[in-house]
Amino acid sequence: MSTLLNPYFGEFGGMYVPQILMPALRQLEEAFVSAQSDAEFQAQFTDLLKNYAGRPTALTKCQNLTEGTRTTLYLKREDLLHGGAHKTNQVLGQALLAKRMGKTEIIAETGAGQHGVASALASALLGLKCRIYMGAKDVERQSPNVFRMKLMGAEVIPVYSGSATLKDACNEALRDWSGSYDRAHYMLGTAAGPHPFPTIVREFQRMIGEETRAQIMEKEGRLPDAVIACVGGGSNAIGMFADFINETSVGLIGVEPAGHGIETGEHGAPLKHGRVGIYFGMKAPMMQTDDGQIEESYSISAGLDFPSVGPQHAYLNSTGRAEYVSITDDEALEAFKTLCRQEGIIPALESSHALAHALKMMRAAPEKEQLLVVNLSGRGDKDIFTVHDIFKARGEM
């Protein structure tokens, strides 16, 4: 099938889906391309982002974290967005696209529950019926978000198959869509999956980097030395990176979850420790067994617990334009606690991975003058019970 936009990033990406879904993807691509040049659509999207979601979000300079070093550290505050995370940006765009295509239902998958909450709020706002697939394990560890989704009228469907986490929820959502795309739009939650989703999600998240550029120029008079973001599927990171890709002086650093440690095999870092394969409608690095089965990923943070990664990140990694590192559960928890204690901000566990790497960079070279920006992709309200139980067990509370 010929496409309007390039479905590949180097060798990564593509549309590896059953034939039955091709017309749905084609319709979505056509709607997206026409919406991008439709002033009325763009005005509506911008208005929702500003007056409903609360954009632009703040760029906050850390007052205390950098003490004793020559680092200047800023946080891009996506945690302040309505819904609690960056997810709200692109679901508003996709919900408007769904309406444009005449769809009446939304199907979504969610891990941490943030994309589920965002899908539920956008559906409630725009009068769409919403059903959300969520791994049974995630339903358990993210109960506040499950209740939020239900409050906003969404149906939450627990998925018990496989590892009962995000990858299984993705499979069920795609299965549902293949039988209902005439009336339903699949609101994919990250910059991964079959074309045109990685491109759509990036474009509906790129205001993160655009705002950051304008704000840092105003505050510091120059671009940052590096922007740092956590990577599960990779939507918050690609939203931050997109506007800086052609600025070679700006380092792009993506942080994958090392879980219990890469050497244990219990992690979610396919970019550096996976092999290329076909999964979830795309060609990308993924965690696989020796016989090519998708392996279970692991992270303390449900939103990073994904065995693959978006194709543009795979491409940026292969060309060396972006650097990808990994952070363990323990390092992320330490960063979580540090930000709470020293800056009075409770970050999501996902975002804590990015922060942990920034702290590592800072401590490794305290004498180095550097300007860093961390994308604080979400707030940590959803994680307080998980963190409470861990700290209590360690005697830290």
From Swiss-Prot:
Keywords: Amino-acid biosynthesis, Aromatic amino acid biosynthesis, Lyase, Pyridoxal phosphate, Tryptophan biosynthesis
Pfam families in the cross-refs: PALP
GO annotation, cellular component aspect: cytoplasm
Annotated EC: 4.2.1.20
Gene3D superfamilies per the UniProt record, alphabetical: 3.40.50.1100
Cofactor(s) demanded: pyridoxal 5'-phosphate
UniProt feature coiled coil, ranges: none
Modified residues (N6-(pyridoxal phosphate)lysine): K87
Molecular function, one GO term: tryptophan synthase activity
Associated pathway: Amino-acid biosynthesis; L-tryptophan biosynthesis; L-tryptophan from chorismate: step 5/5
InterPro entries the UniProt entry points to: Trp_synth_b_CS, Trp_synth_beta, Trp_synth_beta/beta-like, TrpB-like_PALP, TrpB-like_PALP_sf
Catalytic reaction annotation: (1S,2R)-1-C-(indol-3-yl)glycerol 3-phosphate + L-serine = D-glyceraldehyde 3-phosphate + L-tryptophan + H2O
Superkingdom of this protein's organism: Bacteria
Family: Belongs to the TrpB family.
Function (record text): The beta subunit is responsible for the synthesis of L-tryptophan from indole and L-serine.
Quaternary organization: Tetramer of two alpha and two beta chains.
Identification of the protein by name: Tryptophan synthase beta chain
Species of origin: Cronobacter sakazakii (strain ATCC BAA-894)
Gene: trpB
